[in-house]
């Protein structure tokens, strides 16, 4: 039930959907076994993600959850694969920065388009097809919100291609937990999306890893 609430209501850049989906995958791999305390913790984690976002997460929106968001220029996705392919191939992001006293996660919000779409694809593979359409609609909203741009500056362009399939990637000294989180999603999508070019995908997203400390 908590996952359904997260699916139908965008919050914290899709974290509740991501947490819930990973939990379902673990339960599936464990043949339904899950200690009560872990189940309680997962539900709390999803509930926190649903209830505790800050309303001005996206630049240009004072209360994005209660404002109308025009998604007319975002494609209508029929499947999670379509959505995920769009997300990995359309990454135009700016460095995170403070504007008038508020810190905005510009590139952070865009990388979560990828992790959110990957979670929806995983949900489909787990058999939860009833959750896909509302999930895709909330992802469209997230994509639109993440396209907000700072008043100054230019999009960040990655300087090198960083590859999570290479050992050197895992030797990088990075504290940001999104480093491995994004690597998981990108690795999963490269393996599960047909008709994409691995080098193109990695070039599109490597800037995210460069911006992590």
Per-range role (PLM):
Residues 1-213:
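Mature, well-folded catalytic/scaffold domains that follow N-terminal targeting or propeptide regions
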């Amino acid at each position: 039930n908590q996952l359904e609430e997260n699916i139908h209501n965008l919050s914290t850049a899709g974290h509740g959907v991501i947490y819930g989906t990973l939990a379902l995958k673990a339960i599936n791999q464990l043949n339904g076994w899950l200690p009560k305390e872990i189940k309680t913790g997962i539900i709390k984690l999803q509930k926190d993600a649903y209830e505790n976002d800050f309303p001005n997460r996206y630049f240009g929106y004072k209360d994005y959850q209660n404002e109308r968001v025009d998604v007319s220029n975002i494609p209508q996705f029929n499947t999670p694969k379509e959505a995920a392919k769009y997300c990995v191939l359309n990454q135009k992001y700016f460095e995170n920065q403070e504007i008038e006293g508020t810190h905005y996660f510009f590139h952070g919000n865009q990388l979560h388009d990828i992790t959110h779409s990957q979670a929806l694809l995983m949900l489909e593979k787990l058999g939860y097809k009833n959750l896909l359409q509302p999930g895709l609609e909330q992802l469209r909203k997230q994509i639109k919100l993440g396209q907000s741009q700072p008043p100054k500056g230019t999009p960040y362009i990655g300087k090198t291609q960083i590859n999570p399939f290479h050992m050197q990637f895992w030797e990088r000294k990075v504290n940001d937990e999104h480093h491995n989180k994004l690597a998981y999603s990108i690795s999963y999508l490269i393996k599960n999306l047909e008709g994409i070019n691995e080098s193109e995908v990695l070039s599109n997203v490597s800037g995210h890893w460069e911006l992590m400390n």
